[in-house]
Amino acid sequence: MTDSAAPTAPTHERGAFGHPRGLMTLFNTELWERFSYYGMRAFLILYMTDVARGGLGLETQISGAIYGLYTFGVYALALPGGWIADRVIGQRQAVLIGGIVIALGHFTLAAPLVIPGSDYWSFYLGLMFLVIGTGLLKPNVSAIVGDLYEGDTPERRDAGFSIYYMGINIGAFLGPLVCSYFAEKVDWHLGFSLAGIGMVFGLIFYVRGIPALKGAGELNDEALANRDQGRKQLLYGLIGTAVFIGVMYALVASGTLAMTVVGFAQATGLIVVVVAALYFGGIMAFACRDKVERHRIFVIFLLFIGAAMFWSGFEQAGSSMNIFTRDLTDRVIFGWEVPTGWL
């Protein structure tokens, strides 16, 4: 008699160099998603601050605050995005839905091409779609890569992730070259459109390659058994979020709460710092059983600080460095002006 409940690793058909065929599906999906993300990011703040060529004409400080809130939202929503995938819809569906919402976000940003006068509402609505879509797609596509190598050797898994990250780098390199060029040289909204088209390409590769994923990215038995509970928790979370946003909007609109975009961005940054400090402090004070564990948590905390500083500097490439490059850098080579987003 055999135990039918014993977990078994999914059987994945091998492709190039002995890696699962599903790896190339995720390689192409993430390549085009990063193409769209970094392609749009390369000129986002330029569009916000531009006046002469149909941009939003916002002040640099306000534009920087919006950019900061956008990038914060993209990565912060990876937490609920991963939870929704694990408890309710599965990683495979989360990637598909996230990709569709990302494409919708880029095309919403491009709406002024066909809907004159829609610049402001389409801009904020488009960014909201991008934040939600990326929060669903980004953490879960990486998790599916790990599922493909369940039961495989660590060396092969590491090699698979190296190939996967190569796709990320290719997309991040090509996106600004294409999207930023047409945005700066032709029309800002054409750049948004090209970013959306890139995400559509990624969705096509993903949908066509889903059969190669086999069982990777699907809900496990425990999640399926508790799916109804997960749906209820998700519903409560959405209702709570909607109520919070509605109350905050009413307070700001009525003048009861004086809050600017810059002030909101600064408050968000302060909250993140406080939460991180309380989190690590709580672990060291109440969860660590001995000096060795506290030492290890402290090392993790130092690595956390280093990572935060690195990514804070890295994200300047899409904000302050773009403004510096546009205003204070000679970009003319042999009579041709290099697009700001390329640098």
Q: Which residues are covered by each model-predicted region?
A:
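Intracellular loop-helix junctions on the cytosolic face of multi-pass helical membrane proteins
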Residues: M1-H19, G151-D152, S180-N322, R326-I333, ...
